[in-house]
UniProtKB/Swiss-Prot annotation:
PROSITE patterns: TCP1_1, TCP1_2, TCP1_3. It comes from the Eukaryota. ATP binds at residues 100-102, 170-171, 412, 499, 504. This is T-complex protein 1 subunit theta. Component of the chaperonin-containing T-complex (TRiC), a molecular chaperone complex that assists the folding of actin, tubulin and other proteins upon ATP hydrolysis.
Length: 548
């Protein structure tokens, strides 16, 4: 009989074998804070226009070279439960605002770092949390007073371009003026009268070659495809969209045919050909001159399409089909039947074009009232174009935020220093122990201009002392001058470096919530992971006989 070793009395006795648990300040709270600090430190160096890029190779061996925090976090696949909370907060910021994910991470990381100092000084966790929550509430009350201007006309391309400048600049420093103009043109052209802007209506098509300056905007859609038949250009296009293959019907049963003489052999496929001819003719007679199909195109069907001058475009992606239907106002048909006038889509022209050495099909709307706009990105490498796409994505999201709330606050660390100054004053008026936490919360705001300065290679302490000096004189809009050689400051409103009010509001709120949630954890209980050992990686034939 096997010797039974009793479990040690206490909490472990209740749990299954292999489960782990950590409790108390040292084991749980400080460990969690350490993990969050490490994560925030990783993305902190990527903050701002002069932020460094990260090279991430994910589990599928895809290479990412970017300074976009949302992409870095998505591909890192963070496992630590406390660090995951910070990742979730930044994902919430991504969904809510579409920009400012790095702000959430950096700010939450510094809040936790300063909370650790307070806990080691002897404050209790509840006092730190209470102080942080009071300070956060106060910060969100002060924020509306820091608004320096509002967007006046969201249908003016030049004004919109100047407002998108900052969000694009942090991803593509040097190309921001050109890209923000492109994004503004695309967004303004499809802004509906209701003002409800949909981010998905701005599409991106990436084609290798030339440079960023060769990028352009098209009203309509661009597909990285070639046409199937002989017709490559149609003006005043009427499009029929099919989600099925462009082919004759095939029976589900076996089609075995017994042929007795030569005449039967000659007439065998005539019926099929006539049927195909009638089907394609019916589509052409309905007025359609462009056919878009989601499946394969049969040779015989293609022959008759050429005969009746139909342009054939094949799209493999059902998402592309849906977006095209939205662009041209068509209904996707499940069978090869002639479309009615209501089911047909319409656009000014459909043509095959050559961009660089790549063939693309363009569905173009001449009027600027199309449902979808496409930004055609050019660049020397795929990684560069991916990064430009992320900058475009941030710009489009910023435009969406402006359609919801037109208020803007000064960027470049100006808002943060003003908040730090006012919350420190508020902390002085609080009598309890939570005043220490309130002052630390104010100190945490310094991390943003500090990160901007450090990433620009400037002495951070010098920048922060200069900013405080200017803000004490009442200049709320003065922030760090990122383009100066030394530690210099300038008016952000005059320089046009502005952040959205909603981006800051949600950033502060989500970062504080994430930090407080991590601090509230005093015990970690982990079950033993299910499943056996993972197969060894690298050897693709590890389960085959090695002696062959």
């Amino acid at each position: 009989m096997a010797l039974h070793v009793p479990k040690a009395p206490g909490f472990a006795q209740m749990l299954k074998e292999g489960a782990k648990h950590y409790s108390g300040l040292e084991e749980a709270v400080y460990r969690n804070i350490q993990a969050c600090k490490e994560l925030a430190q990783t993305t902190r160096t990527a903050y701002g226009p002069n932020g460094m890029n990260k090279m991430v190779i994910n589990h599928l061996e895809k290479l990412f070279v970017t300074n976009d925090a949302a992409t870095i976090l998505r591909e890192l696949e963070v496992q630590h439960p406390a660090a995951k909370m910070l990742v979730m907060a930044s994902h919430m910021q991504e969904q809510e605002v579409g920009d400012g994910t790095n702000f959430v991470l950096v700010f939450a990381g510094v809040l936790l770092e300063l909370a650790e100092d307070l806990l080691r000084m002897g404050l209790s966790v509840s006092e730190v949390i209470e102080g942080y929550e009071k300070a956060c509430k106060k910060a969100l009350e002060i924020l509306p007073d820091l608004v320096c201007c509002s967007a006046k006309n969201l249908r003016d391309v030049d004004e919109v371009a100047s407002l998108l400048h900052t969000s694009v600049m942090s991803k593509q420093y040097g190309n921001e003026s050109f890209l923000s103009k492109l994004i503004a043109q695309a967004c303004v052209s499809i802004l509906p009268d209701s003002g409800h802007f949909n981010v998905d209506n701005i599409r991106v098509c990436k084609i290798v070659g030339a440079g960023v300056s060769a990028s352009s905007v098209l009203h309509g859609m661009v597909f990285n495809k070639e046409t199937e038949g002989d017709v490559t250009s149609v003006k005043d296009a009427k499009x029929a969209v099919y989600s099925c293959p462009f082919d004759g019907m095939i029976t589900e049963t076996k089609g075995t045919v017994l042929i007795k003489n030569a005449e039967e052999l000659m007439n065998f496929s005539k019926g099929e050909e006539n049927l195909m001819d009638l089907q394609v003719k019916a589509i052409a007679d309905s007025g359609a001159n462009v056919v878009v199909t989601g499946g394969k195109v049969a040779d015989m069907a293609l022959h008759y399409a050429n005969k009746y001058n139909l342009m054939i475009v094949r799209l493999n992606s059902k998402w592309d089909l849906r977006r095209l239907c939205k662009t041209v106002g068509a209904t996707a048909l499940p069978r090869l039947t002639p479309p009615t006038l209501e089911e047909m889509g319409h656009c000014n022209s459909v043509y095959l074009s050559e961009v660089g050495d790549t063939q693309v099909v363009v569905f173009k709307h001449e009027k600027e009232d199309g449902a979808i706009s496409t930004i055609l990105i050019r660049g020397s490498t795929d990684n560069l174009m991916d990064d430009i796409e992320r900058a475009v994505d941030d710009g489009v999201n910023t435009f969406k935020v402006l359609t919801r709330d037109k208020r803007l606050v000064p960027g470049g660390g100006a808002t943060e220093i003003e908040l730090a100054k006012q919350i420190t004053s508020y902390g002085e008026t609080c009598p309890g122990l939570d005043q220490y936490a309130i002052k630390k919360f104010a100190e945490a705001f310094e991390a943003i201009p500090r990160a901007l300065a450090e990433n620009s290679g400037v002495k951070a302490n010098e920048v922060i002392s200069k900013l405080y000096a200017v803000h004490q004189e009442g200049n709320k809009n003065v922030g760090f001058d990122i383009e100066a050689e030394a530690a210099a400051v300038k008016d952000m409103l005059e320089a046009g470096i502005l952040d959205t009010y909603l981006g800051k509001y949600w950033g502060i709120k989500l970062a504080t919530n994430a930090a407080v949630t991590v601090l509230r954890v005093d015990q970690i209980i982990m079950a033993k992971p299910a499943g056996g050992p993972k197969p060894p990686s690298g050897k693709k034939d590890w389960d085959e006989d090695q002696n062959d």
